């Protein structure tokens, strides 16, 4: 398994990966038809200083997963990395790949952006596996957005706001 920055050469594989993950109605927020070439191209722009993106490949170079996040553009919030999305291809889920990818991503965030003090994300309240993963990485539940997410069947589910915060001493101890 290799974790590395995404490159423009990954665009087609990223498109296929995100579309495969979007087939699960309880997975990522985007619907399959919202996973477009333009969307994937926008992810490839999440490179320093505006954001960070990593992919994980197997020994044969096949893309198994991707994670990305971006900084807020307003100066009062530039210490925050937000919009975190992690995807692992359905064939590779449940094998620790997402946790390894996310762990490396957080190390890279600390190294690349020493001024980041907060990494934030949202998860469906019903996505217990994701909530457990995020908590195992140190994220804390900060609140609930009632009925924020509309499911494909028209029903609504709460979203859980989560964050991982760093202090000045964390920069040197992790």
Where are these predicted regions, by residue range?
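Conserved active-site alpha-helix within GNAT-family acetyltransferase domains
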Residues: 99, 125-143
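A short beta-loop-alpha structural element at the N-terminal edge
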Residues: 2-16
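C-terminal "cap" of GNAT-fold acetyltransferases
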Residues: 82, 124-126, 147-174
